[in-house]
Structures are given as structure tokens and as C-alpha cells.
Design a protein with these regions (language model features):
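Transmembrane alpha-helices and adjacent helix-loop boundaries
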Residues: 1-222
């Protein structure tokens, strides 16, 4: 049985350690991308043409360049051009924050601009300052509207963390490949069982995010 492969040696421990690396990359990236993305989204609503052009260039750059290319560029480019030597995990976190901030910022921008103008005008008529209007009216509604898309982005970041293996990070899929390669000749169904377990591990991480998103939507609607 291929299931026995999981209990040979320290295979389960290795997979769990790989999952921890995956979770570390994903959740640290999500945390900072969320904070910076909200700030970036607010900046994107600025009417200054220069600021808008810079923000648009950053967003389009992130969307046009494949994430894998950004990983390679950061991992090898920083060392060669700037003599900055970072480990693979740090590079992944920085690149994912760079990517996630742009995507989250665009979501926040869209949510902010979707607020009806009459609400803002009414707030001004009642004597609220622009800052008070933003904090008490625009921001709370925007965060509610952006939550489903933001959770979807966070789930994508978790799944995309598997690209880390391509720059030498021993995350859960890399560990799975190592186990499969070591056992392929002795166990023909090794890949099926190992990747099945990895699927389950990703599900354990991603499904609670989906449930949390539904919970927030239900609570805010009520």
C-alpha cells in the first residue's frame, strides 16, 4: 500500500515541516500585503496625475511580469547587482508582498471608488472633515466590499507559494517530490499518495479562509 510510505522514516515530519515553511511564506506575505495594500489603495485614489501614473505603472508591472520571473529576478539579481544575499524564504516573502500589495491595492481602490458620491457629500454637509468622512464612512464600507476578493487573493497567495521550490526553498511540494523520487521504483503509487496528502494539507490551510470569508459576509449582511 502506498499509504505505508507516509509512515516510513520521518516522511510525515518532513511533510509537516515543509507545510510550516509554506505557511510561513504565505501568512507573513499576506499580513504585510494586506496592510500595505490598504495604504496603496488609498494612495491610488489620489487625483494627482503623477501619483496616479506611478501607481498605475507599479500595478501594471506586477500584472505583466510573471511571478516566477520576479522570483528569479529578486533571487539572482539582488546577489549579482547589489551584492545582497538573501535566503530563498526571505526572497519569496519580499516578492509575494510586492505582488500582493499591488493586487490588494487595486481591490481597495475599486472598493473606495464604488462608494456613492452622495454619501460623501452628505458627510461634508454635516460638517465632517475629509479625514473623518474617510474613516467613518468610506473605509468601513470599502473593507466590507473588498473582503471576498481579498480572501480569494490570500488563497491564491497560499497556493502560489509552491513556486518557492524553484529557487531552492524546501516547502511542502518540494519535500513531496523528494519522497516520491526516493520511493518511485519501490512504490509505483508513491506520487498518488504523496500528492493526495499535499492536497489535503493545502485544503486544511485554504478552506478555513473560505469559511472565514463566508462568516464575515453573513455577519455584515445581517
Amino acid at each position: 500500500m502506498g499509504l505505508e510510505l507516509l509512515f516510513q522514516g520521518s516522511n510525515i515530519e518532513r511533510l509537516l515541516n515543509g507545510l510550516w515553511v509554506t505557511a510561513e511564506i504565505a501568512f507573513v506575505s499576506v499580513f504585510f500585503a494586506c496592510i500595505l495594500g490598504v495604504i496603496f489603495g488609498v494612495i491610488m485614489t489620489n487625483r494627482n496625475p503623477i501619483i496616479k501614473a506611478i501607481c498605475r505603472f507599479y500595478l501594471e508591472f506586477v500584472r505583466i511580469i510573471p511571478l516566477l520571473a520576479l522570483l528569479f529576478l529578486a533571487y539572482f539579481g539582488l546577489a549579482k547587482w547589489f551584492d545582497i544575499h538573501l535566503d530563498g524564504i526571505s526572497v519569496c516573502i519580499l516578492v509575494f508582498i510586492f505582488w500582493g500589495t499591488a493586487e490588494m491595492g487595486d481591490l481597495v481602490r475599486g472598493a473606495l471608488t464604488s462608494i456613492e458620491k452622495h454619501q460623501v457629500e452628505s458627510a461634508y454637509a454635516l460638517g465632517l472633515t475629509p479625514f473623518q468622512t474617510f474613516v467613518y464612512i468610506s473605509l468601513p464600507q470599502s473593507l466590507k466590499r473588498v473582503t471576498p476578493s481579498a480572501i480569494n487573493l490570500f488563497t491564491r497567495m497560499v497556493k502560489t507559494s509552491s513556486l518557492a521550490m524553484l529557487i531552492g526553498v524546501v516547502e511542502v511540494i518540494k519535500v513531496g517530490q523528494q519522497i516520491i523520487e526516493h520511493s518511485l521504483f519501490s512504490n509505483q503509487s508513491a506520487a498518488l499518495w504523496i500528492y493526495g496528502v499535499i492536497f489535503g494539507l493545502y485544503f486544511v490551510i485554504c478552506y478555513p479562509l473560505s469559511l472565514f470569508s463566508r462568516y464575515l459576509e453573513t455577519r455584515w449582511e445581517s
